[in-house]
């Protein structure tokens, strides 16, 4: 389960990303468009930055206004960037083209100062999803650290930043919170389904709750509407339609 505390979400300006913006707003997670993010000179620092873009990705190659480098500067030490790019089948291209895009994204993250970069391509409805995860190094100089935490009034601020975010226990919890009294909810479902134990709706790729456009081909949530992380979701586990 992703902890959305101290997280910024950057969204490209298209219809699917607008739906995501509303979804994150309901969870009190600050969001900003790519264009507005690029206009700001200084940024508050975050532990996590998500960048979602639907079909459009040319702005990621812009050397004159490098958005990846700006993201790197507004991340805390050891902060994580997660970039999610959806490419529709109607945009053309083949597996080789998609591999080249994924490799270039990884290379651009490296050039922008990130480390521990990984990428993954998964099939989605009517297209593919490229997931890139990169980490901000923890060996930044004091000068860089002071610059990133400037308090001169130009820092990016969002009114939602100061609102409380509820912490939840991860499904694969290793910190001991789950074993210290957090109980699983037992959910009873109809005869076409089975009993199962669920604490929260969890996905291995982290995109399942966003909706079909961002789900992989084998996603068990396929066909279900988007939902909030932490929301209990009932799955139809047999092969018959509802």
From Swiss-Prot:
Sections of the chain in a coiled coil: none
Keyword 4Fe-4S: yes
Pfam family membership, one: CIAPIN1
Motif Cx2C motif 2: positions: 216-219
Ranges where the record places region N-terminal SAM-like domain: 1-140
GO cellular component terms, semicolon-separated: mitochondrial intermembrane space
Signal peptide: none
Subcellular location: Cytoplasm; Mitochondrion intermembrane space
Region span, Linker: 141-162
Taxonomy, superkingdom: Eukaryota
Ranges for region Fe-S binding site B: 205-219
Cofactor: [4Fe-4S] cluster
Any GO MF annotation of the entry: electron transfer activity
UniProt-annotated binding residues for [4Fe-4S] cluster: 205, 208, 216, 219
Motif (Cx2C motif 1): 205-208
One record GO biological process: iron-sulfur cluster assembly
Keywords recorded for this protein, A-Z: 4Fe-4S, Cytoplasm, Iron, Iron-sulfur, Metal-binding, Mitochondrion
Family assignment from sequence similarity: Belongs to the anamorsin family.
Record text on subunit structure and interactions: Monomer.
Note on domains (UniProt): The C-terminal domain binds 2 Fe-S clusters but is otherwise mostly in an intrinsically disordered conformation. The N-terminal domain has structural similarity with S-adenosyl-L-methionine-dependent methyltransferases, but does not bind S-adenosyl-L-methionine. It is required for correct assembly of the 2 Fe-S clusters.
Function summary: Component of the cytosolic iron-sulfur (Fe-S) protein assembly (CIA) machinery. Required for the maturation of extramitochondrial Fe-S proteins. Part of an electron transfer chain functioning in an early step of cytosolic Fe-S biogenesis, facilitating the de novo assembly of a [4Fe-4S] cluster on the cytosolic Fe-S scaffold complex. Electrons are transferred from NADPH via a FAD- and FMN-containing diflavin oxidoreductase.
The name this protein goes by in its record: Anamorsin homolog
Species for this entry: Plasmodium knowlesi (strain H)
């Amino acid at each position: 389960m992703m902890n959305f505390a101290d997280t910024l979400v950057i969204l490209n300006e298209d219809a699917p990303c607008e739906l995501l913006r509303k979804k994150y707003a309901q969870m009190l997670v600050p969001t900003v468009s790519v264009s507005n993010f690029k206009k700001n000179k200084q940024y508050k620092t975050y532990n996590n930055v998500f960048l979602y873009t639907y079909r459009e990705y040319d702005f990621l190659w812009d050397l004159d206004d490098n958005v990846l480098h700006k993201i790197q500067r507004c991340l805390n030490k050891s902060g994580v960037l997660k970039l999610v790019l959806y490419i529709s089948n109607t945009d053309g291209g083949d597996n080789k083209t998609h591999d080249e895009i994924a490799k270039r994204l990884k290379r651009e993250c490296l050039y922008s100062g990130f480390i521990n970069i990984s990428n993954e391509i998964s099939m989605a409805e009517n297209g593919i999803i490229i997931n890139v995860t990169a980490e901000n190094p923890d060996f930044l100089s004091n000068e860089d650290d002071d610059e990133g935490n400037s308090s001169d009034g130009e820092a990016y601020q969002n009114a939602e930043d100061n609102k409380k975010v509820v912490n939840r226990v991860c499904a694969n919890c290793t910190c001991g919170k789950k074993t210290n009294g957090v109980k699983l909810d037992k959910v009873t479902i109809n005869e076409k389904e089975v009993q199962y134990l669920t604490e929260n709706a969890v996905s291995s790729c982290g995109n399942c709750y966003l909706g079909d456009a961002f789900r992989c081909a084998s996603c068990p949530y396929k066909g279900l509407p988007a939902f909030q992380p932490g929301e209990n979701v009932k799955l139809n586990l047999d092969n018959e339609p509802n």
